Swiss-Prot record:
UniProt name for this protein: Neopullulanase 2
Family: Belongs to the glycosyl hydrolase 13 family.
Site feature location: Transition state stabilizer: 421
Pfam families, alphabetized: Alpha-amylase (PF00128), Alpha-amylase_N (PF02903), Malt_amylase_C (PF16657)
Keyword Plastid in annotation: no
Positions of substrate binding: 244, 323, 420-421, 465, 469
Protein species of origin: Thermoactinomyces vulgaris
Originating gene: tvaII
Requisite cofactors: Ca(2+)
Amino acid sequence: MLLEAIFHEAKGSYAYPISETQLRVRLRAKKGDVVRCEVLYADRYASPEEELAHALAGKAGSDERFDYFEALLECSTKRVKYVFLLTGPQGEAVYFGETGFSAERSKAGVFQYAYIHRSEVFTTPEWAKEAVIYQIFPERFANGDPSNDPPGTEQWAKDARPRHDSFYGGDLKGVIDRLPYLEELGVTALYFTPIFASPSHHKYDTADYLAIDPQFGDLPTFRRLVDEAHRRGIKIILDAVFNHAGDQFFAFRDVLQKGEQSRYKDWFFIEDFPVSKTSRTNYETFAVQVPAMPKLRTENPEVKEYLFDVARFWMEQGIDGWRLDVANEVDHAFWREFRRLVKSLNPDALIVGEIWHDASGWLMGDQFDSVMNYLFRESVIRFFATGEIHAERFDAELTRARMLYPEQAAQGLWNLLDSHDTERFLTSCGGNEAKFRLAVLFQMTYLGTPLIYYGDEIGMAGATDPDCRRPMIWEEKEQNRGLFEFYKELIRLRHRLASLTRGNVRSWHADKQANLYAFVRTVQDQHVGVVLNNRGEKQTVLLQVPESGGKTWLDCLTGEEVHGKQGQLKLTLRPYQGMILWNGR
């Protein structure tokens, strides 16, 4: 047993409360080194002579180097001490505690979770756990009111190829008109990229945080949109651009006019005066040298209060949550206060950050409920679209990503295939619809919350920005209606099968050579097995039936029964076919 590879800490994603009397603990060990992992635990103040409770830690998954184990400690009090008992392949056993490793329990020490406070139990909105999110880029979704079209509005056409300065006239009235379409699709929440006043088509350079952009409509129209969506059971999530403002934002205009005498000079990161908006700016911006997007100094109390007032205003209009742009470049203290504010106004409001990398620093229950899961997207691109990785590597990447976060966060990560910032996934697949469908099936069944970028469901293509922002195709004869029906069916299954929204996830099969991948999601006695043939040829696979699973499984997409024999399921899959199998009592 390689002791140097064994890791645990009594915090973060390795020890976190599920409730005031339940603690989830994880342990990492070298792959294949530990065959049994037990956790012995008691109240922190229990005497050494008292009998310890035992919990068996099951294997949560593996990556290329490590196995990960998880146990749920059912605690009699809110104070916990615990030690691991690890057994190797040859029967060798060792205790592992805060002091280190020892053959004697008393010499290994104990890990301690001092006290489980109710305020530290990470909770997320119940509705979000079962949500299917649909992302709308308002300028390109639907034009419902031509009277507010900006000058130079271009023709809304299937073959449109937008430029960075293109406008097509999409607006909020257009979204209202298309709510029946979205309801038919089955989505339960709409995420809007920015809708506040701004000179650009994308609106990430905010001029007025308290006004709807006139090209999109007005406040009464927005309120109608919220009411109509809510009537259909659809939530509304807005984009908050608090990392930076636009160069037409009132405070920045004041700095441009008054220079060092401006009362707002400390709202921004200005190096010297006068302020220069040339290609070489002397102030911090979004990304690198983007003059139209000056970075806000969010640790400034005045900036913080202004942005909090913005959040209050829009929540008073009835929105259900926020997606936070460039969230990883805003200070943590700001987000902690933001969470307290938002949850005080609406405990059921959802807070989602835009973070493209490991977001564990923001997902411990004190800042965000979720993030846009770009780690998921990277793995999905390389497995389904480009074929850069095989099934075994894919499984390893998924496991490693799951272990980054508490299960409350992992359950609600926004699993996206593409967005307004990326190439369309169908384009990434080289237009291969079979590959695309297989990835969508995975997205709709895997742990997390599916996020659909507008138009994916009817087969829209597009390279990177601005091509990924083409106007939505509304003529049915130009839409891929078969793909639309495929999305509808998968969303319907997701809503119907509790395992797909509430279940844990365990790897079932990962064949490096055949590129076959399977996983199982379980809640109580309900199992859903998902089997994916990520190869352009017909293949047969034998799967061991999970211990608690029955012999007969239902193919949810065909309605046919699949019968196990001698503890195995024999399945034959067409090229790029996915199967969703249900087994329960």
